């Protein structure tokens, strides 16, 4: 029955033949069929072109041949509105992506959005494809594109704990304070001290509160009784007098959840009673004046190494 159906549908037969050739990496057959007039831009039931198929399968030589014969990498599928570059990002096919990005379509595909507003950079960050993230940024992909839910690639990398991608994106000046300080608050909520330290060292604002309740990272540290996070936040300039929308300071929050002595409560009581030293105030102000984008250039300042280390918080006991 299938044989009879295929005989009556030569187009379907050709489609299956060229897909089988791609799956097998049979470039000779692929090239021959294209030269005989087979279109590289035909679409299957899912809206996939042969470029989608070969990019997802990692068939680099087939991708090259399809591009040489007029394949259009801007075509989006019917599954989620993904281009072939999205699928290359999903599977970490950096060499295939480079072929597409070096084509005349680069500006049309590098920031192309799926139905949910995901760019290839969102996909690469989500799946932890660090070499792919580097490649997209090398070709000047937008570093902070927003999905339909307002999410950036950096946020996805944080949530999925893709540490390498996080560092790469931050090195390319991704907005560390996106969504009013989401990243630092997320690190605090998850008690991820390494992320917390990384964001603080890179200049994350310690005093941005959630839009829904005004809770700052220090309030959240108090809620979690996380004295290590609280100490880091304080050292990097968190204001112990900032109030949430209920009028509570971090100390008041800590007291409200504990009737007895707790590490974070004890720490907040100590730092709230006494003012910061002039030395610490100067460090906080100098880091603010240097600015987010220039903190990584501290080593180039014409000052003593001990001062550079101090500005980097290398002497903090945390």
Curated annotation (Swiss-Prot):
Keyword Transcription recorded: no
Classification via Gene3D superfamilies: Ankyrin repeat-containing domain (1.25.40.20), SOCS box (1.10.750.20)
InterPro entries cross-referenced by the UniProt entry: Ankyrin_rpt, Ankyrin_rpt-contain_sf, ASB7_SOCS, SOCS_box, SOCS_box-like_dom_sf
Family: Belongs to the ankyrin SOCS box (ASB) family.
Pfam families per the UniProt record, alphabetical: Ank_2 (PF12796), SOCS_box (PF07525)
Lineage: Eukaryota, Metazoa, Chordata, Craniata, Vertebrata
Disruption phenotype: Asb7 knockdown disturbs the meiotic progression and cytokinesis during mouse oocyte maturation.
Top-rank lineage group of the source organism: Eukaryota
Keyword annotations from UniProtKB, A to Z: ANK repeat, Cytoplasm, Nucleus, Repeat, Ubl conjugation pathway
ANK repeats: 13-42, 46-75, 80-109, 116-145, 149-178, 180-208, 213-242
PROSITE patterns per the UniProt record, alphabetical: ANK_REP_REGION, ANK_REPEAT, SOCS
Gene Ontology BP annotations: intracellular signal transduction; protein ubiquitination
Free-text domain note: The SOCS box domain mediates the interaction with the Elongin BC complex, an adapter module in different E3 ubiquitin-protein ligase complexes.
Protein name: Ankyrin repeat and SOCS box protein 7
Gene it is expressed from: Asb7
Main location: nucleus
Residue span(s) of domain SOCS box: 265-318
Pathway given in the UniProt record: Protein modification; protein ubiquitination
Function: Probable substrate-recognition component of a SCF-like ECS (Elongin-Cullin-SOCS-box protein) E3 ubiquitin-protein ligase complex which mediates the ubiquitination and subsequent proteasomal degradation of target proteins. Plays a role in spindle dynamics and genome integrity by targeting the mitotic progression protein PSRC1 for proteasomal degradation in a cell cycle-dependent manner. Also participates in meiosis by mediating the proper attachment between kinetochores and microtubules.
Subunit text: Interacts with CUL5. Interacts with RNF7. Interacts with PSRC1.
GO cellular component: cytoplasm; nucleus
Subcellular location as annotated: Nucleus; Cytoplasm
Coiled coil, from the record: none
């Amino acid at each position: 029955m299938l044989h009879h159906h295929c005989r009556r549908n030569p187009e379907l037969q050709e489609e299956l033949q060229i897909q089988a050739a791609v799956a097998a990496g049979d470039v000779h057959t692929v090239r021959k069929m294209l030269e005989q007039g087979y279109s590289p831009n035909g679409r299957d039931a899912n809206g996939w072109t042969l470029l989608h198929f070969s990019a997802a399968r990692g068939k680099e030589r087939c991708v090259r041949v399809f591009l040489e014969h007029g394949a259009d990498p801007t075509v989006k599928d019917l599954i989620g509105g993904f281009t072939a570059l999205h699928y290359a990002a999903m599977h970490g096919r950096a060499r295939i992506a480079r072929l597409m990005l070096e084509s005349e379509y680069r500006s049309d595909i590098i920031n192309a959005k799926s139905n949910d507003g995901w760019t290839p950079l969102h996909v690469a960050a989500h799946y932890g494809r660090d070499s792919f993230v580097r490649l997209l940024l090398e070709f000047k992909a937008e570093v902070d594109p927003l999905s339909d839910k307002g999410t950036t690639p950096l946020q996805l990398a944080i949530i999925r704990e893709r540490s390498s991608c996080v560092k790469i994106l931050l090195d390319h000046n991704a907005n560390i304070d996106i969504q009013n300080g989401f990243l630092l608050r997320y690190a605090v909520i998850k008690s991820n001290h390494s992320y917390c330290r990384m964001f603080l060292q890179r200049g994350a604002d310690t005093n941005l509160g959630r839009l829904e309740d005004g809770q700052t990272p220090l309030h959240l540290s108090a809620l979690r009784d996380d004295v290590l996070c609280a100490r880091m936040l304080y050292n990097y300039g968190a204001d112990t007098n900032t109030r949430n929308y209920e009028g509570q300071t971090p100390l008041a929050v800590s007291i409200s959840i504990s009737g007895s002595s707790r590490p974070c409560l004890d720490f907040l009581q100590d730092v709230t009673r006494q003012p910061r030293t002039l030395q610490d105030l100067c460090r906080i102000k100098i880091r603010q004046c240097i600015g987010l984008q220039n903190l990584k250039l501290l080593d180039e300042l014409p000052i003593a190494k001990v001062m550079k280390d101090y500005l980097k918080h290398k002497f903090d006991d945390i």
